[in-house]
Amino acid sequence: EAAVTCGDERLTVEHYGVLMQNEYAAEAYVYAVLRNTSGQRLPIQSIQMTVKNGSGRALHEERYVSHLPGVVEPNGTLLVSEWMYDFTKDIGKVASIDITVETDTRAYERWNRLDGVRAWQEGQYLYVELTNTTEETLFGAVCGATLETADGQILDMMLQSSYETMDVGIAPKSTVVWRKRLEDGATLKLGADTVCEAWAYRVETY
């Protein structure tokens, strides 16, 4: 399996998963969870992925990779997810996928971690449940979740966009559930020992 790396000394790759398919078209699902070990807040400007072969030659590049959150606090986690399709005829030669992170000099929004979130896998879906534990209607809540094997390989990931939820309100003590259909490559590797983890944030713009 191809390895996922990050040359940025501020971030450490903790878990990752690469699901490659070449039955109908050359495509890959790439997931990673990185830890901010810099001791500083990191406002994310953009994330790129570079696919390399065993000798380090670039086979393909994705310039705008999905991620969550938009600002990573010290010791916080950064979720990264990308679907690459028709990206190379050399899919069998892929040895590594390198993540490059560009940051801003200052943050223009704050991503506050929320309690009351959990994730689970049931059948063909990854579910995320968020309960508003505050006394006010909660707007701008964004969730992310991973489905992993017992040894930490990420099989699938759900990432929400703040644009999708900024005007959605969750009443106090109320619960909302989202779901994502698992990719085919993930369902083939499902076992009784899979583990789900969830994150939730409230986005506030300065």
Give names to the regions the model predicted.
Residues 28-30, 45, 78, 124-126, ...:
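Hydrophobic core residues within well-ordered beta-strands of beta-rich domains
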Residues 39-44, 58-60, 137-140, 154-156:
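Short acidic/proline- and small/hydrophobic-mixed sequence motifs that coincide with surface turns
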Residues 83-125, 181-206:
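Terminal connector regions
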Residues 22, 34-39, 53, 130-134:
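Asparagine-centered strand-capping/turn motif at beta-strand->loop junctions
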Residues 59-89, 157-186:
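Intrinsically disordered, low-complexity Pro/Gly/Ser/Thr-rich segments with frequent PxxP/GP/PP motifs
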